Amino acid sequence: MREFIPEYLGRFYDELTPQEFYRAIFPKGELEERGKQEHGKYNAIAVELLPKEENSVNARRHIITDDLRLLDELLKSDNFIIISPITYAGRSRVAANARFIYAITVDLDGITEEHYLTDLFFQMKNGFIPEPTYIVFSGTGIHLYYQLEKPIPCFKNIVKQ
């Protein structure tokens, strides 16, 4: 783990809890309520990558509903978990099931020295690259989240395949 990254970010930014972060990405009322199927409401999907074992399932999907309650349980896991800023119909994270994109995420791995972060933030502050809405420490690098003003619909009738 690259300890200098959260230390560096902590000097310049306030930290959000996972619940605060995902509530900002998926505002209250955007996701389906737990136990209800609502027309026009969809869910986020968390994919938990499980330890590799022969002849076993290597991933588990979790449905994230509007109460975000499942986040607390997922945070207890030592497994790698992915939650994209996209809502889906159903349990599968495939393009055909994508319904709305709430943010664009850029994954920057390979940040091995603090001067890489310093250079990145210099470029942001001086307008060479856009400043993200959120910066997330991933454990091996950072994710830059650019939250959209309005979610982009992904329905088949309006998305060019």
What are these regions (language model features)?
Residues 1-103:
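DNA replication initiation on ssDNA origins
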Residues 85, 108, 137:
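Pocket-edge structural micro-motifs
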Residues 89-96, 121-139:
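Catalytic micro-motifs at enzyme active sites that drive phosphoryl/nucleotidyl and oxygen chemistry
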Residues 94-98, 136, 154-160:
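Conserved aromatic-histidine-acidic binding/catalytic patches
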Residues 101-108, 144:
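Active-site-flanking beta-strand signature of metal-NTP-handling nucleotidyl enzymes
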Residues 114-126, 148-161:
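Helical (often loop-to-helix) elements that flank the catalytic cores of nucleotide-handling enzymes
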Residues 135-150:
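Short, conserved phosphate-binding/catalytic loop or strand-edge motifs used
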